[in-house]
Design a protein with these regions (language model features):
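PLP-dependent enzyme catalytic core of the Aspartate aminotransferase-like
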Residues: 63, 99-101, 135-172
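Active-site C-terminal subdomain of aminotransferase-like
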Residues: 1-99, 105-108
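Short, well-ordered loop/turn and helix-capping segments at boundaries between secondary-structure elements
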Residues: 28, 48-51, 95, 118, ...
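Helical (often loop-to-helix) elements that flank the catalytic cores of nucleotide-handling enzymes
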Residues: 100-120, 152-154
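Conserved PLP cofactor-binding pocket of PLP-dependent enzymes
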Residues: 118-142
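Generic non-transmembrane alpha-helical segments
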Residues: 67, 71-75, 111-119, 168
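A structural signal for short secondary-structure junctions
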Residues: 81-84, 115-117, 134-138, 153
């Protein structure tokens, strides 16, 4: 009976010590309570998202993305999924556009990202479906329209942006 009590005491003591170590490792580093500034910022974001202005802005973001995508396609660029229904456009720069003189195939996503950045257009290198290249130097680039729409750009502006992208990549 004494041996069993010692084991129970030893186990209980070990479990208590282990619990303290786990609690110390998790809180406050990994867990914590909500912060008032975070709660307030979520409240403001939800309020703004419910306004007519934000709904109009969101619609304009998608319109701009569609114009960007359509203009790239008209220039022979291979847009993944042949268009967009969101704020993003995914472009294959490795295989490029093969249906027109604007073809710029053979650029990696990393090269295209740098070329466009050097010309004042910020995009992200991005893998594309069935990409055979590394995620660090993929075949595609991802274009978004939210930032420029926030600055007041419209469909006409995005048509010009698309043409500029094609010219930059074609002349690389």
């Amino acid at each position: 009976m004494i041996e069993i009590s010692c084991i129970r005491i030893f186990c209980a003591d070990t479990i208590r010590k282990l619990n303290k170590k786990i609690d110390k490792a998790i809180f406050p580093g990994l867990l914590g309570g909500p912060h008032n500034n975070q709660i307030a910022s979520v409240a403001v974001a939800l309020y703004e998202a419910n306004t007519k202005e934000f709904k109009d802005y969101s619609k304009q973001v998608v319109k701009n993305a569609k114009v960007l995508s359509d203009t790239l396609i008209k220039n022979g660029v291979r847009v993944i999924s042949k268009g967009t229904d969101s704020h993003l456009v995914l472009v294959d720069v490795w295989n490029g556009g093969t249906k027109s003189k604007n073809s710029f195939g053979g650029l990696s996503g990393k090269q295209a990202e740098k070329l466009l950045e050097d010309n004042g257009i910020i995009v992200n290198k991005n893998t594309i479906p069935f990409d055979t290249r590394s995620a660090f130097d993929p075949s595609g680039i991802r274009l978004g329209t939210a930032a420029e729409t926030t600055l007041g750009k419209n469909e006409k502006d995005f048509e010009q942006i698309a043409n500029r992208i094609v010219n930059i990549l074609k002349n690389a």
